[in-house]
């Protein structure tokens, strides 16, 4: 984590805690970081962005007449709301990188927000020439990975000219018995077997599917997650590509006694038919990591 290391090296000693978001990557080409205000107790690093990219995240709204001044912040902002402030404010997306002095950190556990505002000064520091890549949702994972693949735009740095952009098709540790075509987009296949009778659309993420000979047709936006449970059972989940699930709001998994029943349950879920399979909340699922590792080695 070069950026985190740079922040630690260049941060004044009065700051004792660095908080970092685990579902994001910040790419920057600047080695020397911006100076930190000498009177600040809490530092929030941000990146300049456009309303579309900032949608769904915490956004600092900076006064357009004085971009160094934080006017207010919006939690989980939507693009339309941000566009309403275009003439008066510049959106600065919160990177999730925050610095705290020891006193401010200790006070957070005992004080209200109003008390913190009165006792401590918060400064928002923009990271110049930086880009924020979020991996918090399925859609963001695919989009950020594609953008990182195409990060080099300067043709002088590309050995072969006129190369097409990297497509949004990602396969890792997978066996695919049928080719992906130009009609497929936003496809992510990991630790899975796609048999010859499978048919994919776009906005499909498929993970953990064991070796099979099923006849599966996925509609646009349908995603599959399969996990091994116990000695022989599998848990399968059908979820939506565009839905931003949280750790406490995961879709339910359906328990199957073996791989044969797994295929039948999966077909029923895709067709929208009821199943007799027992369901369990995703956050309560106990995965057999040994079987998961064995399956990965097969692929």
Give short role names for the model-derived ranges.
Residues 2-18, 25-103, 126:
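Conserved core of the sugar-phosphate nucleotidyltransferase
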Residues 5, 16, 30, 41-43, ...:
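Left-handed beta-helix
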Residues 21-22, 138:
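A generic "binding-loop/recognition-motif" signal
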């Amino acid at each position: 984590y070069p950026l985190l290391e740079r922040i630690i090296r260049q941060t004044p000693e009065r700051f004792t805690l660095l908080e970092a978001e685990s579902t994001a990557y910040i790419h920057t080409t600047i080695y020397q970081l911006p100076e930190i205000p000498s009177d600040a107790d809490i530092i929030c690093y941000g990146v300049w962005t456009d309303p579309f990219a900032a949608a769904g995240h915490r956004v600092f709204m900076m006064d357009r007449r004085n971009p160094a001044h934080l006017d207010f912040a919006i939690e989980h902002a939507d693009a339309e709301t941000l566009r309403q402030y275009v003439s008066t404010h510049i959106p600065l997306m919160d990177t999730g990188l925050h610095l705290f002095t020891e006193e401010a950190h200790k006070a957070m556990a005992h004080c209200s927000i109003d008390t913190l505002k009165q006792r401590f000064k918060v400064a928002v520091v923009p990271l110049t020439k930086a880009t924020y890549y979020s991996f918090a949702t399925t859609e963001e994972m695919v989009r950020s990975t594609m953008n990182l693949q195409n990060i080099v735009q300067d043709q002088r740095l590309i050995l072969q000219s006129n190369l097409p952009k990297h497509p949004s098709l990602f396969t890792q540790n997978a066996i695919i018995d049928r080719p992906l075509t130009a009609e497929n987009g936003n496809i992510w296949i990991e630790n899975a077997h796609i048999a010859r009778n499978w048919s994919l659309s776009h906005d499909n993420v498929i993970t953990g599917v064991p070796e099979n000979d099923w006849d599966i047709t996925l509609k646009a936006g349908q995603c599959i997650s399969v996990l091994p449970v116990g000695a022989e059972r599998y848990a399968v989940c059908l979820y939506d590509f565009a839905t931003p699930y949280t750790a406490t709001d995961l879709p339910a998994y359906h328990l199957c006694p073996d791989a044969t029943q797994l295929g039948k349950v999966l077909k029923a879920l895709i067709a929208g038919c009821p199943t007799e399979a027992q369901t369990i909340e995703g956050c309560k699922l106990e995965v057999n990591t040994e079987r998961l590792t064995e399956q990965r080695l097969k692929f």
